From Swiss-Prot:
Cellular localisation: Cytoplasm
Subunit and partners: Heterooligomer composed of large and small subunits.
The enzyme's E.C. designation: 3.1.11.6
GO CC aspect terms: cytosol; exodeoxyribonuclease VII complex
Superkingdom of the organism of origin: Bacteria
The protein, known as: Exodeoxyribonuclease 7 small subunit
Record's catalysed reaction(s): Exonucleolytic cleavage in either 5'- to 3'- or 3'- to 5'-direction to yield nucleoside 5'-phosphates
Region called Disordered, residue ranges: 1-22
Length: 97
């Protein structure tokens, strides 16, 4: 006997659903998926489909962040330096000057 999907369920994602246009849309969809999964009302099949979709969205978001990081590196060149924890909290002390 086949189980029918609940009325609010989304169809399974077989990897064919297109990715969002941008990072913000992907992140919003990912947050919605997580909330639905944490709600516990999804069937096993829907949970698996949501997990797969979420994994695709996470990979997409990581790629977008890497692209932006690379663009920042190109724009800033060699001037990028890690911010040390004490740099922002110095009281007017200019060690580099």
């Amino acid at each position: 006997m086949a189980k029918t999907a609940s009325p609010g369920a989304t169809p399974p994602d077989n990897g064919t659903e297109p990715l969002p246009d941008n990072y913000e849309m992907a992140l919003a969809e990912l947050e919605t998926l997580v909330a639905r999964m944490e709600g516990g009302a999804l069937s096993l099949e829907d949970s698996l489909a949501a997990y797969r979709r979420g994994a695709n969205l996470v990979a997409f978001c990581q790629q977008q962040l890497e692209k932006v990081e690379q663009q920042v590196r190109v724009l800033d060149g060699a001037t990028l330096k890690p911010l040390s924890s004490g740099t922002a909290a110095t009281d007017g002390e200019d060690d580099d000057l």
